[in-house]
Amino acid sequence: MKLVLMGLPGAGKGTQAEQIVEKYNIPHISTGDMFRAAMKNNTELGKKAKSFMDNGDLVPDEVTNGIVRERLAEDDAKNGFLLDGFPRTVEQAEELENILSDLGTELDAVINIEVDKDVLMKRLTGRWICRTCGKTYHEIYNPPKVPGKCDLDGGELYQREDDKKETVENRLNVNMKQTKPLLDFYSEKGKLHSINGEQDINDVFVDVEKILASF
């Protein structure tokens, strides 16, 4: 079973990825993990990726695609995998098709976890952290007993810059703009399966299982 998992930040992709790889016994392959492994193993592509990252530059497609090609050729990916964070562009999606074709296989499905932007905003901007002990709260899902104070030590709660409304909204807008052409690409190929990510976590996974039952 060869899958790509998609979803905007806050959609619950990580939770579903954990359940998918456990149930179907396939490796969870994320771009971050691939880069780290390639750099740790000091491969040629890993060295190239490191040089770009050390300079604060984006890793070009030819390097990213090469690292993906190496990873998907490994033994543990022969019977399936869950790709997370790749592809990000239509060009990368086309290259993924070429990589899989060279390996004598193809993608089975692309699962997209859909959540309304307003819901994502609530999920992502509600996080507050205790300055003293680092305990995390969420103003909707896990609020402190006293607003602005930590339950454990009474420490002041603060919000990281990444979790502030303007930052989150900008990140979501950028992601939505990037993702749309990719969703259209896979929809035209008949590979795209969208799931309502606003349900309970277990209900989302039930929907995932229904899709994967046909493969």
Curated annotation (Swiss-Prot):
Enzyme kind, highest EC tier: transferase
GO biological process assignments: AMP salvage
Region (NMP): 30-59
Binding site for ATP: 10-15, 127, 136-137, 199
Pathway in which this enzyme or protein is active: Purine metabolism; AMP biosynthesis via salvage pathway; AMP from ADP: step 1/1
Domain notes: Consists of three domains, a large central CORE domain and two small peripheral domains, NMPbind and LID, which undergo movements during catalysis. The LID domain closes over the site of phosphoryl transfer upon ATP binding. Assembling and dissambling the active center during each catalytic cycle provides an effective means to prevent ATP hydrolysis. Some bacteria have evolved a zinc-coordinating structure that stabilizes the LID domain.
Assembly with partners or alone: Monomer.
Protein's name in the database: Adenylate kinase
Source taxonomy: Bacteria, Bacillati, Bacillota, Bacilli, Bacillales
Gene, per the UniProt record: adk
